[in-house]
Amino acid sequence: MHGHSRNGQAHVPRRKRRNRFVKKNGQCNVYFANLSNKSQRYMADIFTTCVDTRWRYMLMIFSAAFLVSWLFFGLLFWCIAFFHGDLEPSPSGPTAGGPGGNGGGAAPTAAKPCIMHVNGFLGAFLFSVETQTTIGYGFRCVTEECPLAVIAVVVQSIVGCVIDSFMIGTIMAKMPRPKKRAQTLLFSHHAVISVRDGKLCLMWRVGNLRKSHIVEAHVRAQLIKPYMTQEGEYLPLDQRDLNVGYDIGLDRIFLVSPIIIVHEIDEDSPLYGMGKEELESEDFEIVVILEGMVEATAMTTQARSSYLASEILWGHRFEPVVFEEKSHYKVDYSRFHKTYEVAGTPCCSARELQESKITVLPAPPPPPSAFCYENELALMSQEEEEMEEEAAAAAAVAAGLGLEAGSKEETGIIRMLEFGSHLDLERMQAATLPLDNISYRRESAI
């Protein structure tokens, strides 16, 4: 049911908010379901499974592995001692042939145990812990009476070394992982679209909160939106690249201070036909990725974020955050996410803006100051030659009419021509052309 506003206009219901494919903190909002043999596949790659798992789960797994191995071999040692008869109480008291008896026979000798000083399961468990951890208290030990007990000690020592090596290797592989390094790489809360150098551009800001650098840092961006092919196939997550300067190397950045990443909306951009109104009604997501190597460990790290269509501000720019001080540059991160509105930003799409420039705006005429000085001198010389030709023709006409060569009139005409040529020469010498900035820019451009 459509509602109505107070002024009588129909109220258009808001589009359902799109589920993020990548969350703002960089986590991918994807759930895997109905995987066949998932446990077997994860156990086949147990090392990667342990490295990817959380610390608390990993410590619980290794603690359980140690405890199970201690209990298993403790039970094994207890069984060996039990079946050998080491757990039975030794006979005590005087014998028939001993002192106070009538007989003169010797006392019976007690059998040698397999494991010394193991009188129950608790003692066997302690002996198992001492063997696997190589504590070596020296109170309990295995004798040569039972070869099975010796074999059990050897096997437990090997198993203990394997568990220790696996745990240490997993911890050493997990500790230097640059996963948490992405927490100190910052993306702006919003992206903006405004005019830069006469073209509409999509921009967002990235920053590094640590003083340690990200080596070989480079950025990528992809637009994800539903797409219907010509054959009617529906693609819910169609991915299109956004060019951020791959061809000329602008995608590689020196991330010491916050930098604004620019995507120029041109003919190859998926946003080329999208204006302000289309942006408000579109359903898409822009995933931005920052990759590089951690300076301390030389391991590759990746930071991700995303912007929905509702998080892109049309006609805005980012406030400056880098300020020059007397001896250094100051970065004010309190302004990192702030933007300001730019008046005069066109609301049309980049395609319409380009077409309006081609069809409506005429080419500006060249300014008079664009003429070079040599062309001006050539024009003046041509005028002077024409005046001399006219003077020669007048002299020829006067000679044809019978005028004397030395007459005063001819002398006056010649002096007049010389005076005119002298004035032209002074005008040429005093001629200066005012060259403005536009002419200089054009000459440098040529």
Swiss-Prot record:
Signal peptide: none annotated. Keywords: Cell membrane, Cytoplasmic vesicle, Ion channel, Ion transport, Membrane, Postsynaptic cell membrane, Potassium, Potassium transport, Synapse, Transmembrane, Transmembrane helix, Transport, Voltage-gated channel. The record marks D164 as: Role in the control of polyamine-mediated channel gating and in the blocking by intracellular magnesium. Gene3D superfamilies: 1.10.287.70, G protein-activated inward rectifier potassium channel 1. A motif (PDZ-binding) lies at residues 444-446. A motif (Selectivity filter) lies at residues 134-139. It is a multi-pass membrane protein. Residues 1-55, 171-446 are cytoplasmic. It holds the Pfam family IRK_C. Residues 91-111 are annotated as: Val/Gly/Ala/Pro stretch. GO terms for cellular component: basolateral plasma membrane; cytoplasmic vesicle membrane; dendrite; glutamatergic synapse; monoatomic ion channel complex; neuronal cell body; plasma membrane; postsynaptic membrane. Residues 121-132, 133-139 dip into the membrane without crossing it. Residues 81-120, 140-148 are extracellular. Coiled coil: none annotated. GO terms for molecular function: inward rectifier potassium channel activity; PDZ domain binding. The chain crosses the membrane at residues 56-80, 149-170. GO terms for biological process: cellular response to mechanical stimulus; potassium ion import across plasma membrane; regulation of monoatomic ion transmembrane transport. It catalyses: K(+)(in) = K(+)(out). Its main location: membrane. Belongs to the inward rectifier-type potassium channel (TC 1.A.2.1) family. KCNJ4 subfamily. Inward rectifier potassium channels are characterized by a greater tendency to allow potassium to flow into the cell rather than out of it. Their voltage dependence is regulated by the concentration of extracellular potassium; as external potassium is raised, the voltage range of the channel opening shifts to more positive voltages. The inward rectification is mainly due to the blockage of outward current by internal magnesium. Can be blocked by extracellular barium and cesium. Homomultimeric and heteromultimeric association with KCNJ2 and KCNJ12. Interacts with DLG2 and DLG4. Associates, via its PDZ-recognition domain, with a complex containing LIN7A, LIN7B, LIN7C, DLG1, CASK and APBA1. Interacts with TAX1BP3. TAX1BP3 competes with LIN7 family members for KCNJ4 binding. This is Inward rectifier potassium channel 4.
